[in-house]
Amino acid sequence: MPLEVCLLRKTCGISRVIRLLDCFESHDSYIIVMERPVPCKDLFDFITKNGMLSEDMARNFFKQVVETVIACHKRGVIHRDIKDENLLVNLNTNDLKLIDFGSGAYLKNGPYQDFDGKLTFSLLPNYQYKRHIKAVNLKNVKL
């Protein structure tokens, strides 16, 4: 079973994490079925369409992301690839959902030796020295 599925199961019930509906294995791949809030856009497309966020909206989004990261950490999960393309915006409520745990890992106290996320959003010293710690998850939150 892919680690992403295990991480999604551990975060089940966190309101701002995409919900795993089902998963099954085919002959050469694993199929993951997740909820799709309607109507929604990822945060990148939302900003592209609507322009710069107001200060109030940016503050609201930032608060939601931080609360979600903290909730994931309490469940022993670190996302490691938080970026605008991995946040869905519900267009009716402006609630966010964190998606794509494919770069995630189980939370641990020591440094991480691997990284699968997008280098653009990583902290360079951690990439150079191949160290990834829990604090990086919050340092990478940008709006």
Task: Identify the residue ranges that each predicted region occupies.
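The N-lobe alphaC helix and its flanking beta3-alphaC-beta4 segment of protein kinase-like domains
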Residues: 1-14
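Short beta-strand micro-motifs within the conserved protein kinase catalytic domain, predominantly
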Residues: 19-28
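A conserved loop-to-beta-strand element in the N-lobe of protein kinase catalytic cores
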Residues: 27-35, 44
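AlphaC helix of the protein kinase catalytic domain
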Residues: 42-53
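Activation segment signature within eukaryotic-like protein kinase domains
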Residues: 61-62
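Catalytic-loop of the protein kinase fold
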Residues: 73-90
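Conserved activation segment of eukaryotic-like protein kinases, specifically the C-terminal portion
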Residues: 113-126
